[in-house]
Amino acid sequence: MKKTKILFPFLFSLLLVISGCSKDDDEVVDGTDDITGGEEPELPTPEDPEALDLSQYSSGQKVMMQTFYWDVEPRFEWWNNLSDKVEGWADAGIDRIWLPVATKGQSGGYSMGYDPSDYFDFGEYDQHGTVPTRFGTREELENLISKSHDLGLEVIADIVLNHNSGGGLEYNPYREKDTYTLFNEENGNASGMFNRNYEHFHPNDVSQSDEGDLFFSEQDVDHDVPYVQDWLWKNENSVAKYYKNEMGFDGWRFDYVKGFGTWVIEDWMNEVGGFAVGENFDGNADVLVDWVDATGVSAFDFAAFYKMEEAFDRFDDLNYLDGNTLRKVNPDKAVTFVANHDTEKDENEDNRIATENKMKAYAYILTHDGYPTIFYSDYENEAFNEEIKQLIEIHNSLAVGDVEVLHVDNDEYLMKREGNAENPGLILYISTESTTKRRNVQTNWNNVTLLDYSGNTTYTPTSDENGMVTIEAPANGYSIYSITK
């Protein structure tokens, strides 16, 4: 009996201990992590906080749309397809549209334009087996540009300056063989503008090669030749000035800029100006920074792209999001993106961001500094469309101020945009954990209820008098917090 009396209280106490341990083990929200130290605030939260009217706020910057993917369909109808979509894009907060290469390539009706043959055939000459380009006729393109301008959209031309393709065969004394370097009215240049021959490609009596990487070596355009400069950007009817003054293009996306010197971009821009971005396909941020400094124009931030791929896919480690990128060094010249026509068709999974991780990547680029680009196929994907539109609205309204990384580890990434006197800014919280996560963070907002403007969580905490608040991220997702009214 004495043993029983002693054992019963002991068992009761043990049950209490076990019960307490079970409660901790079942807790799916981690409220113990504390970025700034101190105790997690326990403040009342209103049941129905009133969201800000985001239309009353402006970040001062919008978003560009890449309007194509590789081998778009239907062929010959793409300009009309885009004309049907530009009004919706403008309403969503897009301010520029990047069109595919608009002129005739060697592959004719199948060409995506990166095998340029006739720089002035916008779909009006019968050559390479077709009158229209893959995308349609010149008239349809002009209608698209006109409609876009009426909606306040700038139109960006895709320009291939490095190489040509689709010319006729001629004897080339510099190579001592026949080469496909003859471009005239009968050979791939029906417009008769900017006829070319072997003297306009490397090697010739002006230069053996340029300072860029070699690509399409037999038809590698020699920009040192004065005739080439005249036709590409100097003459009043040059490619640059014709595209701007006759066709109405507002800016430029330069293809494969590794293939020629930075001075080519400088000379082009000195003649026609406008927004410009270069495709320098390199994940090394230092390479991108040097190129931007040399040319004075923007570059696609491939360094940021690969950091996102490493963070979300390859290494599953969000620390990579805080790595070195063009955006971190020169955000005003960084054009960020999640996918493009090249990455999406790449069979190497390390060169594309997995579909299941794309929305976290879009949340990243649409809350950070830099100029975001949306990929056509992602925006038009019904599974992504509404979410991307919401992120664009958040970007265009609240993505303001300096970027401060509040916390980063393998599974969590928290970033604050400081805002300014007229704009509260935001906090991004990305988590790849399998359960809901919470973090205690320091904000600029005192005694105010917060709301996740992405709509991914309904948790609405209130900050204390010092701006401390606990925010929440859903499992394997993100939230974007800012103040309420």
Feature annotation, model-predicted:
Residues 1-8:
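Bacterial N-terminal signal peptides that target proteins for export
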Residues 168-192, 196, 265-279:
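A short alpha/beta connector and helix-capping loop motif
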Residues 35-66, 81-94, 101-103, 108-122, ...:
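Active-site-proximal helices and loops of the catalytic beta/alpha 8
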Residues 1, 14-54:
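Bacterial Sec-dependent N-terminal signal peptides
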Residues 58-63, 105-146, 179-223:
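Aromatic- and acidic-residue-enriched carbohydrate-binding clefts of CAZyme catalytic domains
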Residues 133-169, 173, 177-179:
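Substrate-binding cleft of carbohydrate-active enzyme catalytic domains
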Residues 76, 100-101, 108-112, 159-160, ...:
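Short, solvent-exposed loop/turn and secondary-structure capping segments
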Residues 224-239:
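Alpha-helical scaffold elements lining the catalytic groove of polysaccharide deacetylases
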